[in-house]
Structure formats: structure tokens, C-alpha cells
Amino acid sequence: WGKKSPTFTREGVYVDGESNLHMAMVKKGDDYFSAQLQTGAVVYDLPKDSKGFWPFGKFENPKFMHKFGYYECRCKLPKNNGWHAAFWLQAPGIGSHPDPKYGGVEVDIMENYRQAKEGNIICGCGWGGSEWFGHVAFPYVETEDGWHTYAVDWSEEGYVFYADGKVVSRQMAPKCAVSHVDEFILLTTECHGYNRIFGNESA
């Protein structure tokens, strides 16, 4: 959304021998950094090409884009308070068209920044021109082995969100804006928000 978090890093990431991707918090000096995985980019986040007239960066070919279908992540959530993790979908040209059907909609399948203080996970999507805008909070329930699955079933009619196999929210048109354009996937972590700290400030 216009700028990248200054605490993103390419360090602290590895794949173990069981096909699990690990993202570890990395300390540099007096601050902490963490990584993210994304298969595309928002146009506004690309570094500006100084030779271009318009304030956009050089277009980057996405690694994976798709529209409609079932998207699922199996994960363990961060153990440190203040460490924000999310699984979401985004459109490269979000905000570029007055109708989100053509410009895209941010779809937050799972965000855990309320977990430490409120014991909740949130999901949802929204757009300022729709009747409904915002997120739905649902209780975080620990599993025996610590693994969780978060998912969304995205169709032309809307979105159905799942947590550990259970439906936690249904957001359907016309109350909810529905994207009809290809979007990319993000699995992200942030030690700090863009303009604020999530959870425990010590993290």
C-alpha cells in the first residue's frame, strides 16, 4: 500500500526436510526483522522507475496469479507477541477502478494481530463502496500439535472463510464486494506494522 515495511528481510527463511517453510524472526542491531512470501506485487509498491513519467515502478511478472477457487494454508502461528502473521490475497491493480469487480479486493484469509491481546483471529474482505466493510473476529483455539488450516473458497458469488475445517464467515455479494480479477497470494509476517506496533511492544 505505497511503501514496504522497513522490517522486511530475506533472511531467516528456510525449508526443512519435510516441505515446511520456516520464517524466523531476525535481530539486527536494536530492531527485529522477518520475511514474507508473495507471488506477485501491487503496482504502487514497486520502486519507482526514475526515467518514467508516471509514479510507478517497472512492471514485474507475477510468479502465480489466479481467480476463483479454494485457497488453503497449513501453518503454525508465531510464538512471539507483537509478531503479526497473515495469509491473504491481493490484486496488482487494487484501487485502479471504481468497481472492485475489475480493480480487485484484498482478501484477508487469516490475520493474527489480535491473538495476543484479545485471543482472536480475524478474516474478511471489504471495499469502501460496498454495503459491508471490515473483518470478522473468531476465537483462536489451540490444537494438540499446534498446526492450523486457514482457507477461503472464492467464487463469483462471494467468499466463504474456514478455520481448522469450520466455516467462520460467509461474505457474499451484493453486501460484500467480490473480485473478478486474478490475484496473487501472500504469506507474510511483520514485527512492526507500517505505522504502529501490533501486540506486545517488546516484540
Language-model regions: role of each:
Residues W1-A203:
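GH16 jelly-roll
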